[in-house]
């Protein structure tokens, strides 16, 4: 049976799959569109399983305020092109709505949206992953998104404009803790050990190296804490000094960046093209 363009168009509209996939599905079912849809749903699950091994390190960070808390969500895909796709963003926003409705765990979000995720993988041809969700308590908050890749929420006693500026600072400067004294003892001890070793390797006697490290450790805890960092909008002041002038405090913050901690697989362009050609010849 000859498959008409109109039938292919209808199947594309109903499934969102590619033209060649639709044509192939209709040929396999002799033009039975309902059976083709069933088969594509089944093969879509298989396709999603194949894509699951692909590294998803692109994506988006979304933020939404709930009742007394704010949710930050990361959803990943494989390419920055898909990260801007309307279907991908619609899926991510659906997950966000549920997360912000009641502090739903990432495990429960994954389970609830698995069927929709599988369908989306089949539709766009990339692995999709609901990677993480974090929540920060407080009503007095400011949120900042730098493009789609970085999301920050800061809570404290400051006014909205001040908190927004602090959120922008966190996005740019990547502090790990609020105050220098919040840096865990084990982190300080590990850094001290490294700095002593560096000083000894520079030729300093151990007892002198130990004394030198005290200054370096103060610098280290300042660099990794929000209040110890130079404020990006007034670099001559630390964030702590800026807050003191404002009579304000920061209670907590969360910063998420797309793909942080995910090891990307690097392939050169020629190798990627060769891989695609080989795959098409096997099909």
From Swiss-Prot:
Compartmental location: Cytoplasm
Residue span of region Involved in Mg(2+) ion dislocation from EF-Tu: 79-82
The keyword Cytoplasm appears for this protein: yes
Alphabetical list of SUPFAM superfamilies matching this protein: Elongation factor Ts (EF-Ts), dimerisation domain, UBA-like
Predominant place of localization: cytoplasm
GO cellular component: cytoplasm
GO MF terms, alphabetically ordered: translation elongation factor activity
Pfam families named among the record's database cross-references: EF_TS
Family: Belongs to the EF-Ts family.
Function: Associates with the EF-Tu.GDP complex and induces the exchange of GDP to GTP. It remains bound to the aminoacyl-tRNA.EF-Tu.GTP complex up to the GTP hydrolysis stage on the ribosome.
Name used for this protein in its record: Elongation factor Ts
Gene: tsf
């Amino acid at each position: 049976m000859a498959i008409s363009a109109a039938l292919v168009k209808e199947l594309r509209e109903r499934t969102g799959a590619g033209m060649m996939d639709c044509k192939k599905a209709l040929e396999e079912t002799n033009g039975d569109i309902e059976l083709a849809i069933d088969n594509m749903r089944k093969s879509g699950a298989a396709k999603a399983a194949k894509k699951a091994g692909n590294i998803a390190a692109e994506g988006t960070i979304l933020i939404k305020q709930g009742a007394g808390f704010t949710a930050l969500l990361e959803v990943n895909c494989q390419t920055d092109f898909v990260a801007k796709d309307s279907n991908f963003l619609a899926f991510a926003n659906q997950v966000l709505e549920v997360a912000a409705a009641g502090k739903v765990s990432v495990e429960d979000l994954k389970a609830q949206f698995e069927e929709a995720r599988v369908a989306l993988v089949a539709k766009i041809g990339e692995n999709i992953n609901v990677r993480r969700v974090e929540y920060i308590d407080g009503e007095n908050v400011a949120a900042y998104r730098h493009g789609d890749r970085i999301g920050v929420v800061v809570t404290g006693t400051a006014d909205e404009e001040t908190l927004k500026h602090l959120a922008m600072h966190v996005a740019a400067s990547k502090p790990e803790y609020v105050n220098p004294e919040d840096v865990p003892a084990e982190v300080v001890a590990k850094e001290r050990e490294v700095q002593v070793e560096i000083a000894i390797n520079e030729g300093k006697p151990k007892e002198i190296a130990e004394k030198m490290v005290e200054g370096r450790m103060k610098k280290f805890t300042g660099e990794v804490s929000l209040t110890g960092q130079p404020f990006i909008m007034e670099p001559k002041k630390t964030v702590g000094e800026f807050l003191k002038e404002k009579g304000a405090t920061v209670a907590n913050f969360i910063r998420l960046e797309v793909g942080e901690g995910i090891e990307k697989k690097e392939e050169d362009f020629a190798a990627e093209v060769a891989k695609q050609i080989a795959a098409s010849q096997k099909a």
